[in-house]
């Protein structure tokens, strides 16, 4: 099986790396947080002293980092990773970043004889742990076919969105819609509650009606309506407000670059920005319900 280097062992990267180990891959890992590195090493991964050291002898390099700036620094800046990667290696970046950044890094990788895919994911930490992630891939079809067995060890659905950067664009579109959807659902549930409706009954009605949506079915923002969702544990865990705000910011950047109109996306961005500024940045994004409820 392929020798893999995995860089970035945070809330998403760590369970993804563990699933590769479970699938039998030889894994060398690196993270700037020593505790995260040590945890994967205990599970069978080989800890590297640096990112460049981790890619020595690797056939596939995977990164999962927080933002565009981190990906740029790793591959193009102070991380100096690209020169350390052997020609012919496949590079897969699973971070959610600006499409322009993905294109720039892929171009630099190609200049060094490397194939690179942008492969952001959907499914959250639960999907990462259960190996049911959706991979949204941009890059050459041949590179994707080479990556498919590895991605299949970490996820359930794999889509080829198009050329380099297309995976990021599709992911941004999806998350913009999700942010809008959650804010709208929170508003509808709050309206129903204010008018005397049982929110659980209202949710059941909407699930069987034209307002049906993913958030309503599996991620209800109202505490107590669903078990095992962030709303029923004080909005702890899940997908943070600040992460949603980051993705809505990426959508705004993409819209500006292409002169696309996203009025609802911008409104959602403003709402999550207000929510974050009020101290909710680390809470799950479904906590936008609290902002709606606080409005007078």
Predicted regions and their residues:
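Rossmann-fold NAD(P) dinucleotide-binding segment
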Residues: 51-63, 67-115
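NAD(P)+-binding Rossmann beta1-loop-alpha1 motif at the extreme N-terminus of oxidoreductases
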Residues: 1-64, 89, 94, 125, ...
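Helical "substrate-binding/catalytic lid" subdomain
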Residues: 166-267, 271-296
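Hydrophobic beta-strand scaffold residues
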Residues: 27, 47, 115-117, 158, ...
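Rossmann-fold dinucleotide-binding core
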Residues: 4, 9, 96-175
């Amino acid at each position: 099986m392929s020798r893999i280097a995995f860089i970035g062992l945070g809330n998403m990267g760590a369970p993804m790396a563990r699933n590769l180990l479970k699938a039998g891959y030889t894994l060398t890992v690196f993270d700037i947080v020593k505790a995260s590195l040590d945890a994967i090493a205990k599970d069978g991964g080989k800890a590297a002293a640096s990112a460049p050291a981790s890619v020595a002898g690797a056939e596939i390099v995977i990164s999962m980092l927080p933002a565009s700036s981190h990906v740029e620094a790793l591959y193009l800046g102070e991380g100096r990773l690209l020169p350390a990667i052997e020609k012919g290696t496949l590079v897969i970046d699973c971070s959610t970043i600006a499409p322009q950044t993905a294109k720039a890094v892929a171009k630099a990788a190609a200049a060094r004889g490397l194939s690179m895919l942008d492969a952001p994911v959907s499914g959250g930490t639960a999907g990462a742990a259960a190996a049911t992630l959706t991979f949204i891939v941009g890059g050459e079809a041949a590179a994707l076919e080479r990556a498919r067995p590895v991605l299949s060890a970490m996820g359930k659905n794999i889509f080829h969105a198009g050329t380099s950067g297309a995976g990021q664009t599709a992911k941004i579109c999806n998350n913009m819609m999700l942010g809008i959807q959650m804010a709208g659902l929170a508003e509808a549930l709050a309206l129903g509650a204010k008018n005397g409706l049982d929110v659980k009954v209202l949710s059941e009605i909407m699930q069987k009606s034209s307002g049906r949506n993913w958030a309503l079915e599996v991620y209800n923002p109202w505490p107590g309506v669903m078990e095992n969702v962030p709303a029923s544990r004080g909005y702890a865990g899940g997908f943070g407000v600040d992460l949603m705000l980051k993705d809505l910011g990426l959508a705004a950047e993409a819209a500006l670059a292409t002169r696309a109109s996203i009025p609802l996306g911008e409104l959602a961005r403003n709402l999550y920005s207000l929510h974050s500024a009020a101290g909710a940045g680390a809470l799950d994004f479904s906590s936008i319900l609290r902002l709606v409820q606080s409005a007078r």
